[in-house]
């Protein structure tokens, strides 16, 4: 958690507290955060969704009585609202994020004591821990490949869960070319294809129509091409994707002998520990979709929560799926 990281690094924490539908009664909450774990240094509070200056006066009084510095607030502003959907915030090209950030910055400058905030952050807090950059701490050293690779990355409204750090790592391996499965780009010539996560279920109809690209991906895989697919990217590699609304199944690339469905979807979330061939792997699970595999395909590993409880999410080791033609894969 962010609190654990703050404790390990011995850095101050500024809490952003929603003041919606609360006033002075927020005092016990603030007091609890301050005293629950003394190793986590709560340095100040910024309130969000404050309705008026008089509302803020009650909140500031709560901070005084709880013994925590009040740094300011953000007023309730319609223009700062970002709608959410099942995997997070709705960020689209239709809305300028720069405009939203500029508006937020203007409000922060007006209602938050930035001098006090910066003073808190600039203090010297010696860190008691050091993490050597080695495989012994779970962080392996990274050496760029001598051979420069050609890397193709899907990036469009359906595939956009991309971490900047991953792009930096891939850039060290070679040159990057972006393409769009949704808008019908051709598959670039590549040594590695990266299909990141996103919302393919919202664009299943458009993806289903990209026969040329799907056939190119399939041929690439059959000829030994390397594909890194995460979450939504893996959904694109299945035989079909069934949409939540209407229950229509759309044919995908068919590279994996699996089907994916959003019907009856529920949240799968949490830290995971996997036992596989004598190895223990750790990671994080976060998805709503379900994979449907042939009965003859068993899960190859057991998966456990951080508390040691076994979870039902299967893990498959798939051979490349082949069928005579794309028509046979259409459902």
Write out the residue ranges for each language-model feature.
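Phosphate-binding active sites in nucleotide-utilizing proteins
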Residues: 150-154, 158-202
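A short helix->loop->beta-strand "cap" motif at the edges of active sites that frequently abuts
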Residues: 11, 68, 223-225
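Inter-motif core of Ras-like GTPase G domains
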Residues: 2-18
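C-terminal hydrophobic structural anchor segments
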Residues: 265-304
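Cysteine-nucleophile active-site neighborhood
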Residues: 200-275
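Internal gly/pro-rich beta-alpha loop/helix module
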Residues: 24-134
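Residues that mark the start of a beta-strand
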Residues: 148-150, 252
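Conserved small/polar residues in nucleotide/adenosyl-binding loops
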Residues: 321-330
